[in-house]
Amino acid sequence: TVGMMPNEMLDNLKGMISKRQIDRLWVVGSNNDTAPIIDASFRRLLGILEKHFTSTPYLISNRPSSSDFAMYGQLSQLVNFDPTPREICHEVSLRTVAWVGLIEDQSGIEVDDEQWGSIDTLPSTVKELLAEIGKGYVPAQLANAKALENGDKEWQTEIDGCLWKQKSFPYQAKCLKLSLIHISEPTRPLY
């Protein structure tokens, strides 16, 4: 296990992992220019989730869904491991911190189809959440896809009233394409 590694080996592993993660920051557009945009959006997201979790235990219904597990995948790292966002999470939304702990183990939950809500019963915070995601994610995805279509290695667009510049990333264009297929043909398998 990692805990039993000799210190020199552990330090090498730590350096290798840190370098790999830092070298990939371009993938998410994280740099000094975009940091304020990312921070503001993250804080707004946490504020929405704080409000949301006062009325419902999960993201879109009274039982966990794929949206919970997708959001958990991202937030678990930010709440549990990265010290900067962890501090922000504890400052802005303790309910989100608790929710990450809840989603960690759903093995004992009993679910039935009665627990699914309908679009008419979604809390207003779901619309706020989608609006926040759409404010940054959609313009980025569209600009990235257009850049790749034009053969551009970089792209820029306005996000949250600020200029966002980033290297083009084919995987994100693939995600956009699959999302658009799913929206237009919800029952079609994506793969």
What would you call each of these model-derived segments?
Residues 44-48, 55:
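Ligand-binding pocket segment of bilobal, Venus flytrap-like solute-binding proteins
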Residues 181-191:
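Single conserved hydrophobic/aromatic residue that forms the stacking wall/gate
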Residues 59-79:
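GST superfamily/GST-like fold recognition
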Residues 172:
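Conserved phosphate-interacting/catalytic interface
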